[in-house]
Structure formats: structure tokens, C-alpha cells
């Protein structure tokens, strides 16, 4: 049976950075040094060969200008005395041969004396017989040699012979090989220095890369990108100059920024971002800024900015932020569910008490009183709860209203749901959360306005028609002063004293974000009435 292996084991792990760099640099060094070696060796070979040839030519020219050689060529080969002179020079300069010939190529000297008087062997002497110096590689009686030829002239500048000098080719090759070894050792030394430098470079790179391999860096980068784009919080990163270097999708949505449409570069965003969030203090002192509230394009954002350090040096900052309105919606949605649960719990205790009463009447066999009690209880439920659940189809809104009715009762006031109210459930959580925020704020404001003296009355009307929910909240409290009613929805304006006036501003913002509207009427000492209109997906939820 074949066992499956983990994915990481099946993947072929890329070559390590150190191995890759060493191999690449070694290959480049080897290629460069090989080319240098070939070129340099070729030049050294030519220079060595030319140097030996020039040395031989210098000796040949000296002999050609010698009076003894000129005079000797006027005699017979065996009587000329040239052999003794040539052999002395040959041995002194470690040459293979020195041959002096007349114009008929007859030898006047040779390392093998018996060949004196015989013709010179080789066609490479012909140029010299015609008055031209010549260098050639050829083989005579002795060995393969590098041979040079120089014409000999008398006092009247008439050519009377040729001096031929030979260098054993193996000697030339030996000198070239000796030079070649010095080149090879230089190349090997260069390779060694290059490898040592490469190892040092690899160590420096590994330190810069925190010991990570390239494929690990690639994996971390992909994971970082996936993480940044998957979180709901907006993320904006800046460098030590305050220039934006990174922005994730959530931040683009919250800031209404689209790179493909608004900017081809982040420079414009960097300028606007520095005006919205002051990161200079964070970059200068490294002091984090936490839980700051800023407003961007009618959105209330909760932002945290922290410095980014590398080796103790601040190299940038990261800001994370989230729509605070959304956070409040979630909290209010949770409050609605909690209120619904509390209302059910309270009603369960109430019904438990009523069941105990029914059980007691059964034991006492007071059937007439039992009948009256059950009928009264059923009527009360129908009036208070049954009618509400029949009109309000959203369990969350129903539970919320029940909790507010109970709260008003506990405070000695009355909260009434208008008999004409009808509210279908909505498929939009934003709409439900906004309605809970709106009703909660308006009802709580009304309860505070009614004060501790009991007997106040609050009425709520919810009417759905053609995709719109019309909501009215009335109370018979003290009303709103005329000088404040026009600014009642402004942030910081309140009838409850200082450090208040946020709730209605938030309600207005949420209602308008949905495309709705809110208005107020009030007559001091008589009433206050709020009118709210928001879109409501009631028809969609009933499909």
C-alpha cells in the first residue's frame, strides 16, 4: 500500500542561498579566469617564441657582420675557420645549431663537422638567399627547431652567404610551459580569493536576510500578503519619511481609495494620509498612539499607530484601524440579542409564578377563580406580548421592544407600541442594527427626559410601506429648547449637560449612511416627536 507523504516532503526544496551563490560566483570566476588564461597564455606563448627568435636573430646578425665570417666565405668550407667561430658562439648561447652557408647553400659550419661542405637542408633558407630575414619552424638533421636566417653582405653590400641559427623546439615549448604554470597558479589564487570573498558575501547576505533562504522569504511574503488581505481591519504602513509603502484591501475600502482609479503611485495617498494621521511623533519618539478617533469621509474610525523597529532603529510605522460605526453596530446588535434573552427570561419567571397560582387554585378546587385567572392572563398576554409579536416579525426587534417596555415600567412610565404598527423582518443586518441604535437612543433619551417622576408616556409607531420603514417616537416630556432644536443632531449638542451629545449625531450618521433621514419636532413643556425613515428589505425577507 502506498503511503501519502506530507506536502512539504513531496515538494522539491530549492537549493540553499549559500550553495547557489557559491556555484554561480564560482562558475563566473572560472569562466572569466579561463578566458583570461587562454588569452594570456596565447600572448605569453607568442611573446616567448618571439623573444627567443629575436635573440637568435641578434646572434645571427652579429655573426653576419663579423669580418672573420665574411673573409671565411672567400675560402673553401674546410679552410675558412668559420666552424670554430660558429661552434664557440653556439655553445655560449646554448643553441641547437649555427650554420653558415654561401650563396649555393653549401655549409661552412655545422655541429656535426662531417656535414660541412654539404647543401643546407630545408626550403626555409630560400628567402634569406634572396636577401630577406626569415623565421620558421622546420626539421633538419638534428631535431625540430625554431630556425632564423639572416643574409651576409660584403663590404660592397653584395650578398655572399646566409647565417642560420636553430633553437630546439622542445626548449621553446619548455619555456612556454614554465610561463604557463605561473599563469595557472595565478588563476588558482584568483579562484581561491574569489571563493573566500563569496563565502564572506554569503555570510553577510544571510545576516541581512535574518538567516532565511529565498524560498522561505517568498513563502513569508505570500503569507503576509494573504494575511493582510484577509483581515477586516485596515492596515497602512509608512517608511521613516512618512511615505505610504503598503495598504491592504480593507484600508482601501475604508478610505475610498482605489489605486487603479485614483493614483498610479502611492505618493498622493502619502500626502493625504499624513494630513489625516500624524505619524511624525511615532517616527520621532517611538511612542505608540492607541485608540484614537478620526473622521475620514464621514466615517468614524478607531485607529492605533505603532512604530516599526529594526535593530533598535525606527524604520517606519504601521496604522491599523476599523470603522467604529461598525463596532458600535455589532455592540448594539449584541445588546438587542441580550435584551431579547432578558425579556424571555423575565417572562419565563412571570409565567412560572402564574403556573404556581394555577396549581394552587387546582389544589383548592377553586375552578371558578381558576377560569377567571386564566382568561385574564391570556387577555393580558394578548394585549401586551401577543399583539406585539403579531405586529413585529423580527425577533430581535420584538425582544428589544419588550425589554424597553419592561424598563419603562420599572421606571414608572409607559411605553406603548401603536396599534397600527407593522414591521416585517429584514434580511439586512445593517438595517436591523441601525433601527436598534435609533430606537434605543430615542427611547433612552425620552426616559431620561421624563425624569424620576412616574406617569410619563412614550409611544412608538413602526410602519412599513414599499421598501421603506417609517418610525415615530413621541414622549410627553419637557421638550427641547428652541435654541437647541436646530442643532440637536450636531456632535456635542445635548439637553443633558456637558460631555454628552454623541448619541443623536451617531444615529443621524447611521441613518443617512443607509440612505434614510431623521427629523424632530418639539414644543417645550408638551411633547417631543422624532421622525425616522430608512430603507427596509421587508419584501425580500418574506420571499
Swiss-Prot record:
Residue numbers carrying Phosphohistidine: 349
Reactions it catalyzes: ATP + protein L-histidine = ADP + protein N-phospho-L-histidine
GO biological process: phosphorelay signal transduction system; regulation of DNA-templated transcription; signal transduction
PTM section of the record: Autophosphorylated. The phosphoryl group is rapidly transferred to DcuR.
Recorded topology in the membrane: Multi-pass membrane protein
Effect caused by changing residue 110 to A: Abolishes the stimulation by fumarate to the same extent as complete deletion of the dcuS gene
Pfam families membership: HATPase_c, PAS, sCache_3_2, SPOB_a
Regulation (activators, inhibitors): Autophosphorylation is stimulated by the presence of C4-dicarboxylates such as fumarate or succinate. DcuB is required for converting DcuS to the sensory competent state.
Quaternary context: Homodimer. Interacts with DctA and DcuB. DctA/DcuS and DcuB/DcuS complexes are present both in the absence or presence of fumarate.
Protein name as catalogued: Sensor histidine kinase DcuS
Gene that this polypeptide is encoded by: dcuS
Amino acid at each position: 500500500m502506498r503511503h501519502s507523504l506530507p506536502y512539504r516532503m513531496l515538494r522539491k526544496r530549492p537549493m540553499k542561498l549559500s550553495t547557489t551563490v557559491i556555484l554561480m560566483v564560482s562558475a563566473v570566476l572560472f569562466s572569466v579566469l579561463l578566458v583570461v588564461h587562454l588569452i594570456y597564455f596565447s600572448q605569453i606563448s607568442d611573446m616567448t617564441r618571439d623573444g627567443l627568435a629575436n635573440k637568435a636573430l641578434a646572434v645571427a646578425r652579429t655573426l653576419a657582420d663579423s669580418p672573420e665570417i665574411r673573409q671565411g666565405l672567400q675560402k673553401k668550407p674546410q679552410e675558412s675557420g668559420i666552424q670554430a667561430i660558429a661552434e664557440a658562439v653556439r655553445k655560449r648561447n646554448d643553441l641547437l645549431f649555427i650554420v653558415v652557408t654561401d650563396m649555393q647553400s653549401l655549409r661552412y659550419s655545422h655541429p656535426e663537422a662531417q656535414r660541412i661542405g654539404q647543401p643546407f637542408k630545408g626550403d626555409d633558407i630560400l628567402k634569406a638567399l634572396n636577401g630577406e630575414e626569415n623565421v620558421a619552424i622546420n626539421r633538419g638533421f638534428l631535431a625540430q627547431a625554431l630556425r632564423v636566417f639572416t643574409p651576409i653582405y660584403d663590404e660592397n653590400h653584395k650578398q655572399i652567404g646566409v647565417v642560420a641559427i636553430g633553437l630546439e623546439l622542445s626548449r621553446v615549448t619548455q619555456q612556454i610551459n614554465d610561463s604557463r604554470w605561473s599563469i595557472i597558479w595565478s588563476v588558482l589564487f584568483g579562484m581561491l580569493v574569489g571563493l573566500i570573498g563569496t563565502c564572506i558575501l554569503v555570510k553577510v547576505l544571510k545576516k541581512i536576510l535574518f538567516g532565511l533562504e529565498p524560498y522561505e522569504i517568498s513563502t513569508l511574503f505570500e503569507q503576509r500578503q494573504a494575511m493582510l488581505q484577509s483581515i477586516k481591519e485596515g492596515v497602512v504602513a509608512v517608511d521613516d519619511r512618512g511615505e505610504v509603502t503598503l495598504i491592504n484591501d480593507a484600508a482601501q475600502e475604508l478610505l475610498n481609495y482605489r489605486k487603479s482609479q485614483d493614483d498610479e503611485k502611492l505618493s498622493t495617498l502619502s500626502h493625504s494620509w499624513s494630513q489625516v494621521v500624524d505619524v511624525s511623533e511615532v517616527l520621532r519618539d517611538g511612542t505608540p498612539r492607541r485608540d484614537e478617533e478620526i473622521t475620514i469621509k464621514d466615517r468614524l474610525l478607531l485607529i492605533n499607530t505603532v512604530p516599526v523597529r529594526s535593530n533598535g532603529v525606527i524604520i517606519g510605522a504601521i496604522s491599523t484601524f476599523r470603522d467604529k460605526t461598525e463596532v458600535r453596530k455589532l455592540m448594539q446588535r449584541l445588546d438587542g440579542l441580550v435584551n431579547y434573552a432578558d425579556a424571555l427570561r423575565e417572562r419565563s419567571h412571570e409565567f412560572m409564578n402564574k403556573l404556581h397560582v394555577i396549581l394552587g387554585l387546582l389544589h383548592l378546587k377553586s375552578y371558578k377563580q381558576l377560569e377567571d385567572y386564566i382568561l385574564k392572563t391570556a387577555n393580558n398576554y394578548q394585549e401586551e406580548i401577543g399583539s406585539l409579536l403579531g405586529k413585529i416579525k423580527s425577533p430581535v426587534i420584538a425582544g428589544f421592544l419588550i425589554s424597553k417596555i419592561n424598563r419603562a415600567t420599572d421606571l414608572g412610565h409607559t411605553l406603548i407600541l401603536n396599534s397600527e404598527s407593522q414591521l416585517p423582518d429584514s434580511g439586512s443586518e445593517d438595517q436591523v442594527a441601525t433601527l436598534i441604535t435609533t430606537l434605543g437612543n430615542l427611547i433612552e433619551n425620552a426616559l431620561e427626559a421624563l425624569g424620576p417622576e412616574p406617569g410619563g408616556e412614550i409611544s412608538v409607531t413602526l410602519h412599513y410601506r414599499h421598501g421603506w420603514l417609517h418610525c415615530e417616537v413621541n414622549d410627553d416630556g419637557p421638550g427641547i429648547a428652541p435654541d437647541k432644536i436646530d442643532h440637536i443632531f450636531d456632535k456635542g449638542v445635548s439637553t443633558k449637560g456637558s460631555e454628552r451629545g454623541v448619541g443623536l449625531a451617531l444615529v443621524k450618521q447611521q441613518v443617512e449612511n443607509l440612505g434614510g433621514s431623521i427629523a424632530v419636532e418639539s414644543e417645550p413643556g408638551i411633547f417631543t416627536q422624532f421622525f425616522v425613515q430608512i430603507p427596509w428589505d421587508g419584501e425580500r425577507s418574506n420571499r
